[in-house]
């Protein structure tokens, strides 16, 4: 004899089937929403990173050499300048001392000298504070009212790949051109090379040389 079993309720069975189907739809929709949100987040991150890279463009100088007729004869990228290339460093340091110490009655030219001095200085380096202090106590514009100073760089010697000794002579004249004094100075400059990162820096400081520290004294 077959065991007694309660007859199935068709309404309950239909309700259970509906619940199972609807629940699977809900779970599938939730999964797709999660995938969509993750995809949108990745797209936003990728777009933001692309925008960041677009603002970080690094300019590299490209040299084109021409002959007397203006015809291109050689092209290419300049070689990376290392500390061993003392000729370039010497020339740059000679210009630095000349710009820093020269005094002229032409205010526009004097400002150019000062600007050229600060092109090789960074705000975080000790040399900047020392030269700031010098200019605060020795205004070249005030000095130019009574005298001018011309600079002759006598010698630049590499003490290491980062430190150089600079000897120079200063010729002071009154506003009539009469020489009123000659003094010799010696400076010790510590330099560093940093690759230029933008067009403005390339124009002003193409090799990326900065004077990290600078001390100078008068010689007897």
UniProtKB/Swiss-Prot annotation:
CDD domains: TrbF. Keywords: Cell membrane, Conjugation, Membrane, Plasmid, Transmembrane, Transmembrane helix. It is a single-pass membrane protein. It is found in: Cell membrane. InterPro entries: NTF2-like_dom_sf, TrbF, VirB8. Belongs to the TrbF family. This is Probable conjugal transfer protein TrbF. It comes from Sinorhizobium fredii (strain NBRC 101917 / NGR234). The gene is trbF.
């Amino acid at each position: 004899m077959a065991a007694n079993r309660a007859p199935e309720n068709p309404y309950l069975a239909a309700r259970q089937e509906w619940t199972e189907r609807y629940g699977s739809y809900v779970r599938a929709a939730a999964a797709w929403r999660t995938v969509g949100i993750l995809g949108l987040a990745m797209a936003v991150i990728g777009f933001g990173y692309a925008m960041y890279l677009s603002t970080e463009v690094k300019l590299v100088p490209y040299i084109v050499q021409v002959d007397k007729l203006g015809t291109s004869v050689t092209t290419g990228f300049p070689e990376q300048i290392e500390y061993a290339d003392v000729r370039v460093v010497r020339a740059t340091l000679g210009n630095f001392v000349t710009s820093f110490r020269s005094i002229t009655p032409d205010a526009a030219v004097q400002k150019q000298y000062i600007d050229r001095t600060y092109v090789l200085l960074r705000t975080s380096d000790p040399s900047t504070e020392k030269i700031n202090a010098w200019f605060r106590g020795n205004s070249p514009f005030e000095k130019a009212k009574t005298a001018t100073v011309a600079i002759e760089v006598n010698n630049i010697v590499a003490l290491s790949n980062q430190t150089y000794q600079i000897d120079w002579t200063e010729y002071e004249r009154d506003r009539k051109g009469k020489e009123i004094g000659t003094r010799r100075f010696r400076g010790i400059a510590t330099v560093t090379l940093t690759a230029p990162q933008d067009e403005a820096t390339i124009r002003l400081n193409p090799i990326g040389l900065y004077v990290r520290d600078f001390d100078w004294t008068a010689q007897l």
